[in-house]
Amino acid sequence: MSTVEEDSDTVTVETVNSVTFTQDTDGNLILHCPQNDPDEVDSEDSTEPPHKRLCLSSEDDQSIDDATPCISVVALPLSENDQSFEVTMTATTEVADDELSEGTVTQIQILQNDQLDEISPLGTEEVSAVSQAWFTTKEDKDSLTNKGHKWKQGMWSKEEIDILMNNIERYLKARGIKDATEIIFEMSKDERKDFYRTIAWGLNRPLFAVYRRVLRMYDDRNHVGKYTPEEIEKLKELRIKHGNDWATIGAALGRSASSVKDRCRLMKDTCNTGKWTEEEEKRLAEVVHELTSTEPGDIVTQGVSWAAVAERVGTRSEKQCRSKWLNYLNWKQSGGTEWTKEDEINLILRIAELDVADENDINWDLLAEGWSSVRSPQWLRSKWWTIKRQIANHKDVSFPVLIKGLKQLHENQKNNPVLLENKSGSGVPNSNCNSSVQHVQIRVARLEDNTAISPSPMAALQIPVQITHVSSTDSPAASVDSETITLNSGTLQTFEILPSFHLQPTGTPGTYLLQTSSSQGLPLTLTTNPTVTLAAAAPASPEQIIVHALSPEHLLNTSDNVTVQCHTPRVIIQTVATEDITSSLSQEELTVDSDLHSSDFPEPPDALEADTFPDEIPRPKMTIQPSFNNAHVSKFSDQNSTELMNSVMVRTEEEIADTDLKQEEPPSDLASAYVTEDLESPTIVHQVHQTIDDETILIVPSPHGFIQASDVIDTESVLPLTTLTDPIFQHHQEASNIIGSSLGSPVSEDSKDVEDLVNCH
């Protein structure tokens, strides 16, 4: 990745050129990376290699004038060997307590994820040798080891799973096969002989490890859930009858062979359950020290045969013995201290200092060494799993992005100790807060292009947008209020990328004036409800946009639309409706137009018009419904159901437990269900209590229902911008919760153990 940053990790950019987006059939935003075009790449950059990912302009560049800064990215061609990477954009506003600096700019922090560089899809000789070997014998392993080859073991990272799934999809597409299960479970070995070697490209793992992973992913019987007492009894009977014929036992129980094998391994007829007695603890300690030739008080975490320990203890299984010793008894005997919140923050910082690309590369033994409050390396890793679940979609972000988010979260909690203790109540403001920060995360993942279209590389973007109130340094006690907006609908939203700004209170409670560094003002209404949908209403002038929170009832039952546009020197992103696109991929295309200037709009227009799109894309027109008035303001809604994508959110450990108790409720009259996940959690963005003098950082989208699909503008039905009135002040408290569904419950201990056992194979 190329930037012009010098001593800092932060660079300041202005709009350089336009970028083209589309949307695929799965609802992903697609960033098209144009080839070397003299119109899109400056002459001084033309000599640069064509394999850059992003090109950013520096604030110090002499070509940048004093215009209001805007966000822009010029995408240059991606090479065929390029892999997915992560970009974290952080919009930072530094303002005085009572005024906004004219020099305030929008900054972008780039976080490069190079962890896939070592596992290129083309593969080096080393990777190819490993990923093409089954390792069926010890001689195979020894042979490659003696040649200096190394390979990954243990848990699979998210990036590895992404590579595996992408390889499988390419294999199916090339052979016209719709379902991978046809190959895995129905074809003979001869028919699928090249399958596993093909999908293993780019993975530094033996073929047998890939084979086991694929079986677990596609065998539905492997995800049935926890064994019931009845199944345990049935399993015991089948084990006596069939011995180690795991396939037969699994078929009888409706579970996979690997699942029943692992469950039998952990099962013991004579096991006690519940609280350990003092006699059991004493016997466990004696057996462990005897088998490891250690003294009482010594720390023992490795080299223990738990099967042998369980046999000597007699009343507990090997799983119970291992858990009791590593999570409590050894720590108690060695005089350990209690784990504190400071230890949790210290763990995050220590992991960040390791600078590893994947958590599977962490040496937990080394990390736990000399740490008195750590009960064992295994316990420390379990503690890390608990910590990272504070990020709701921790499974969907890369490890560097996850670490960065956790560091920011705990830094905020350190500066604001009452943040999570009183989300809706009152409290004292933070005197250390002198700036407002908003994080906008963009995840860029490489996609395979359609063979029917010219082979240009592309990348998919997912943009969680979060809104957080940040109180002033001298403000009195106030309540914390935050909302999270997620973007991913049937048609793309029209929204404006704004420079940095702050929020000025108005005379109406809950309504603020969004003041940028220019003269533009954007009144904004926010409610205390943690789940809101922001909708654009009629502007009072060409310089303003009204944003109002609507309740889900109105979103579902009306079809009124309105689209507004600020004709100011900003970057406007617009879209077209799906039905208007003549693309074989059924994609939608939109452009970031960076060439808008005030001179382009000498007079306020009488009607709103769409930006110019490429010739091959129909030009949708944007109109304001004539029925727009005070009575209909609460009826603005999406014409089509919207699927909200997951955003990076913060959850406390208590909320994680509470979330597990919630049940998913299907919406009654949606063709496509709203999907939200634990939106009541505080966001990852910096938050403190809010008062009338609060400052806020946000990027405002308009929901996709505000995109008018019609190609014809009825000029008689379009009201002049200056004649529309502000209707929202009477309705600013009409928001209510969207139907939510809880996050998946934390993995049970049984399933975790099964996963650990499999990873050892």
Curated annotation (Swiss-Prot):
Residue spans of biased composition, Acidic residues class: 37-47
Region (Interaction with CCND2) location: 1-237
Region feature Required for DNA-binding, mapped onto this chain: 87-458
Region (Disordered): 24-51, 584-625, 740-761
Region annotation (Interaction with CCND1, CCND2 and CCND3) ranges: 176-761
Domain Myb-like, residue spans: 225-263, 339-388
Gene3D superfamilies membership: Homeodomain-like (1.10.10.60)
Keywords assigned: Activator, Cell cycle, DNA-binding, Nucleus, Phosphoprotein, Repeat, Transcription, Transcription regulation, Tumor suppressor
InterPro entries (UniProt xref): DMTF1_DNA-bind_reg, DMTF1_N, Homeodomain-like_sf, Myb_dom, SANT/Myb
Span list, region Required for transcriptional activation: 87-170, 459-761
Cellular localization per UniProt: Nucleus
Signal peptide range: none
Main localization (coarse): nucleus
GO cellular component, one term: nucleus
SMART domains (alphabetical): SANT
Summary of the knockout phenotype: Mice spontaneously develop tumors with a mean latency around 80 weeks. The most common tumor types are pulmonary adenomas, adenocarcinomas, hepatocellular tumors, B-cell lymphomas and vascular tumors. The protein appears to be haplo-insufficient for tumor suppression, as heterozygous animals are also prone to spontaneous tumor development. Mice lacking this protein also exhibit enhanced susceptibility to tumor induction by activated Ras or the application of dimethylbenzanthracene (DMBA) or ionizing radiation.
Tissue-specificity statement: Ubiquitously expressed (at mRNA level). Expressed in brain, intestine, kidney, lung, pancreas, skin, spleen and tongue (at protein level). Expressed at high levels in testis and thymus (at protein level). In all tissues examined, expression is predominant in non-proliferating and differentiated cell types. These include epithelial, interstitial and smooth muscle cells of the intestine, differentiated spermatids, sperm and interstitial cells of the testis, and lymphoid cells of the medullary compartment of the thymus.
Induction details: Expression is induced by activation of the Ras-Raf signaling pathway, and this may require JUN and JUNB. Expression can be repressed by E2F1, E2F2, E2F3 and E2F4. Expression is also repressed by non-classical inhibitors of NF-kappa-B signaling such as doxorubicin, daunorubicin and UVC, and by the NF-kappa-B p65 subunit (RELA).
Zinc recorded as keyword: no
DNA-binding region residue numbers: 306-329
Subunit structure and binding partners: Interacts with the D-type cyclins CCND1, CCND2 and CCND3. Interaction with D-type cyclins may modulate transcriptional activation by this protein.
Known function: Transcriptional activator which activates the CDKN2A/ARF locus in response to Ras-Raf signaling, thereby promoting p53/TP53-dependent growth arrest. May also cooperate with MYB to activate transcription of the ANPEP gene. Binds to the consensus sequence 5'-CCCG[GT]ATGT-3'.
Stated family: Belongs to the DMTF1 family.
The protein's name in its UniProt record: Cyclin-D-binding Myb-like transcription factor 1
Gene that produces this protein: Dmtf1
